[in-house]
Amino acid sequence: MSRLNVELPGLDLKNPVMPASGCFAFGAEFSQFYDLSELGAIMIKAATKEARYGNETPRVAETDSGMINAIGLQNPGVHHIIEHELKKLEQFDVPIIANVAGSVEEDYVYVAEHISKAPNVKALELNISCPNVKEGGMQFGVDPQVAAELTRKVKAVSEVPVYVKLSPNVTNIVEMAKAIAEYADGLTMINTLVGLRIDGKSGKPIIANTIGGLSGPAIKPVALRMVYEVRKAIDIPIIAMGGVQNAQDVIDYISVGANAVAVGTANFQNPMVCKEIIDELPTLLDKLGVDHINELYGRTHEVMK
């Protein structure tokens, strides 16, 4: 039996490593670098009811230990994604987690109902926490009751388990998680932190949207803390993300209570990073003296007792 396999609602993962939505396009582009069947899963780019052209450029700015982006959920629309992008991925033996976004509740429900019927989509990721769009997006992710109600409506039409992506831009993430957990099958966390970078010469924001989402190694301590707090409060499957660059980062997240881990910004720096992390994990398990990665699950909570 594999030392890395993980079972979650709707997801039978060969290993706990997957690319995060928005950092891997629709996946097929990366197949030139390695066999995508080696991944635990693929979180594809967000799908909306209609095609979105995204925000004005520039949309990306490098920061110390990370980057700020304001792409604006650019995508060709849910039906194009189902008919073209998802079909390209059918050749790979890997479960797909489809990211669902929208401007109003009805958009989320529409996208979820349609994309959850695709044969290789095994779970949905409900994107209620994107800080880069002027309507929808994060507005659903900062009010516990609104988030819970949206989750309930999406869950009612989805043919696969529903995971909800939590925003770190809230006062109390545990309160959000508890409200959503009433209807969700799992959580993904965290989305980007709202950030700003300005040009030192002119004082103008570098990104046309003014603000954007901060990601990369800079946010890992925040994400670790939030995963730790949510896991301490409730028992629900968690796919963690935020600054993952190597196998030790994966171990850190599993230690605080994540079941699996998604790699985001690092894919832009190194398209091989997910495969390298997967290959590195058994060696790290040997060094830690454990047979299966699940033995490390939640160990931080155990040593704190």
From Swiss-Prot:
Its EC number is 1.3.1.14. This is Dihydroorotate dehydrogenase B (NAD(+)), catalytic subunit. The gene is pyrD. Keywords: Cytoplasm, Flavoprotein, FMN, NAD, Oxidoreductase, Pyrimidine biosynthesis. Binds 1 FMN per subunit. It is an enzyme of class 1 (oxidoreductase). The keyword Thylakoid does not apply. It comes from Staphylococcus carnosus (strain TM300). GO terms for cellular component: cytoplasm. Its main location: cytoplasm. The active site is at C130 (nucleophile). CDD domains: DHOD_1B_like (cd04740). GO terms for biological process: 'de novo' pyrimidine nucleobase biosynthetic process; 'de novo' UMP biosynthetic process. Pathway: Pyrimidine metabolism; UMP biosynthesis via de novo pathway; orotate from (S)-dihydroorotate (NAD(+) route): step 1/1. Catalyzes the conversion of dihydroorotate to orotate with NAD(+) as electron acceptor. Its cofactor is FMN. It catalyses: (S)-dihydroorotate + NAD(+) = orotate + NADH + H(+). InterPro entries: Aldolase_TIM, DHO_dehydrogenase, DHOD_1B, Dihydroorotate_DH_1, Dihydroorotate_DH_1_2, Dihydroorotate_DH_cat, Dihydroorotate_DH_CS, Dihydroorotate_DH_I. It is found in: Cytoplasm. FMN binds at S21, K45, A46, N99, N127, K165, I190, G216, G242, G243, G264, T265.
